Regions:
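Active-site-proximal alpha/beta segments of enzymes that process anionic O-linked groups
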Residues: 1-28, 33-192
Length: 192
């Protein structure tokens, strides 16, 4: 079964090393249904992402211009994004390690805050979110901590992370899985 293969591949992940005289915080955001052509970060004339624009101006945000998801479905994209396989070389996601496990073995603290976590285990999305990302073995190999609840708004999820799990180590991988543009814009932010 694919999930068992993914667990085996992640268990075999090589232990990496990191320099003792440096520190690094990597923030990985799964934005969900983000349409780059509707954001001024990619040249859209309206200021639709003012906070991201400020972060870019401060040098805190790198904009990728040549990345395209291989799939239009979250479940397939997440499995192939979180594993180290090459789709170009026709490698299967479950034959390669889960990249957060590699970071953790290298000495990083790894945090995963997910606003789409659900108790549903049926269907394609349920399989991805629960059976894969929250498999007990993969989770113990990969996460220092993960969120145990979801929020109405994405900014509440991020606030919860910084309130409850500020990074304490020198090396941190912080991952946020947001609702993003999956839901109606009027429902994405508080009206105040």
């Amino acid at each position: 079964n694919e999930l068992q293969e993914a667990v085996k591949a992640s268990c075999k992940a090589e232990k990496g090393t990191i320099a003792d005289n440096d520190s690094l915080n990597v923030v990985y955001i799964i934005g969900e249904s983000f349409i780059k052509y509707h954001t001024n970060l990619y040249g859209y004339p309206l200021l639709t992402t003012p906070r991201l624009t400020k972060e870019k101006a401060k040098g805190n945000l790198y904009i990728f211009n040549d990345v395209v998801s291989a799939y239009a479905a979250t479940s397939l994209t997440i499995r192939n994004t979180f594993c180290c396989n090459s789709l170009m070389d026709k490698e299967k996601w479950y034959h390669t390690p889960f990249f957060p496990a590699i970071f953790k073995r290298a000495g990083f603290d790894v945090y995963y805050w997910d606003n789409q976590k659900t108790d549903v285990t049926e269907g394609l999305t349920g399989f991805t979110t629960n059976s894969f990302l929250y498999n007990k073995t993969i989770a113990s190999l990969s996460y220092t901590a993960s969120s145990d609840k979801t929020f109405r708004y994405d900014d509440q999820l991020i606030q919860d992370y910084f309130k409850n799990k500020k990074p304490t180590g020198k090396y941190n991988l912080i991952m946020f899985h947001l609702w993003g543009q999956h839901i109606d814009a009027a429902s994405r932010y508080p009206h105040n």
